[in-house]
Regions:
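A detector of single, family-specific signature residues
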Residues: 1-326
């Protein structure tokens, strides 16, 4: 026990989390005396994590802290957050914060040091939203991934058409608008397009330039090219349908927070999809953030203000939360 640390908790547990093992140290005792420390090691398999949970309950330890090590902390957090009917404090701490605290003995294990700092009240946990919002995150972040896949698939199709001699982008503002998709479907079926077929594919506004567009599409696809275009185009349509499925699921979840949803949607440029992403990342309880400056900093939208001798230095915003920023 470091003489420079003043204990405020009678019981605390520190977890040193790795990919395959969890080292847990329980420190317990009066705040004005040397505490007893007990260390146990568990694997990261579910039965072992259940043993850790049982030890927490048996010890009646309601204050736990661990480093935010990759994704390895997540199943442990999920396992422990329901202990004592939710009346438990679990801090997920940035490792940099603990390294900056002086007083650590050279032979002290990581788990014991975490428990020691927690017992002294020197740890500040990262923001972890409630389970319902973490589950909503799965959907909103997955949607973002699907949108990325859709963009990649569109680029793949556009590149293939360009390499096959079809210059869609020369006269169509959107290759995948209604006119562009009609043309692609016709090429898949017939391999080429004539003026009459093109006239049926084009919408009213683009028909005025039908002769120019016909020149840009004056090519033909081989049997192999038609089959390949069919495959990649069907994949695009499947991805788009899947995106709608994910959006429907996330909308169903976010409608449980109608007041917050309506408030966010009242902001110009924020629709239900964007509002769902915001709610998933920060929840609806803003008490974790003292003011707007804190949440902007957490999101990574507050640039530094480095000034020396009247000269301002160029600075960048921090990484923050990339899902909230985008």
């Amino acid at each position: 026990r470091s003489e420079s640390l003043q204990d405020i908790l009678t019981c605390a547990m520190g977890l040193d989390v790795h990919r395959d093992i969890i080292v847990a140290c329980l420190v317990k005792g009066a705040v004005d005396a040397e505490p007893e420390a007990e260390t146990r090691t568990f694997s990261t398999l579910i039965p072992e994590m259940q043993k850790l949970r049982d030890w927490v309950i048996e010890s009646e330890c309601r204050n736990i802290a661990m480093e935010s090590t990759g994704i390895y902390w997540q199943p442990i957090y999920e396992m422990l957050e329901s202990c004592f009917d939710g009346e438990i404090s679990i801090l997920v701490v940035n490792a940099r914060h603990m390294k900056n605290v002086p007083g650590r003995k050279t032979d002290m294990k990581d788990a014991q040091w975490i428990a020691t700092l927690l017992r002294a009240g020197l740890l500040k946990g990262s923001f972890i939203p409630d389970k319902a919002f973490r589950e909503l995150r799965h959907l909103t972040r997955y949607r973002k991934s699907v949108v990325h896949d859709i963009t990649a698939q569109k680029n793949r199709i556009d590149k293939f058409l360009q390499s096959s001699g079809f210059r869609f982008t020369a006269f169509l503002s959107d290759t995948f608008g209604a006119s562009g998709r009609n043309i692609i479907r016709h090429l898949i079926e017939h391999g080429s397009i004539d003026r009459e077929a093109l006239d049926k594919c084009l919408k009213t506004k683009t028909r005025n330039r039908i002769d120019e567009i016909l020149v840009a599409l004056n090519g033909s696809l081989s049997e192999h090219q038609r089959r390949f275009l069919n495959m990649v185009f069907r994949h695009l349509e499947d991805l788009e349908a899947h995106k709608h499925t994910v959006e429907d699921e996330s909308t169903e979840e976010v409608l449980k927070h109608t007041d917050t949803l309506n408030l966010l949607c009242s902001i110009p440029g924020i629709d239900v999809t964007a509002a769902a992403a915001i709610i998933a990342e920060i929840g609806t309880d803003m008490s974790s953030f003292p003011d707007s400056q804190h949440i902007c900093s957490w999101a990574g939208l507050s640039p530094g203000n480095n000034e020396s001798a009247g000269k301002r230095k160029s600075v960048h915003i921090n990484k923050g939360n990339p899902y909230l920023k985008s």
